[in-house]
Amino acid sequence: ILDVHLSDEYLETFRGTGMCVCTQLGSTAYNRSLGGAVIQEGLDLIELSEIAGIHHSKSRSLYAPIVLSKDTRVKLSSESFEKAILGVDSDVYPIDDIKEFEIRVCDQKRVRMIKGKKISYFKKLNSLF
């Protein structure tokens, strides 16, 4: 059970396996497999997608991915993250002793991509999928 706040404003109490939070670069990976949108290159956005949400009459959540401004702070909190993990790219961190954490885009750090042939973003995207 996760309480989800966006920039200190309550959004929902989520019941399910977890949440995927990504930027444009990560939108073509795990986020896409969850039914999230692929974000166009150059857009500074955050996308929040549910992982295996439980949806019935007593447990409702947004149920759809949500695209947010890069300035949005995503806070996830729970009474117990026992046996939970936080995955960041290919790294995994246990979060047993944590009650809440905040995810945000950091202006000081950017990923630099090696660029090869000049191929449009949409042609690259089309060749991947």
Task: Label every PLM stretch briefly.
Residues I1-G16, T28-F129:
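Catalytic phosphate-donor-binding core of small-molecule kinases
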Residues T17-C22:
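AMP-binding/adenylate-forming core of the ANL superfamily
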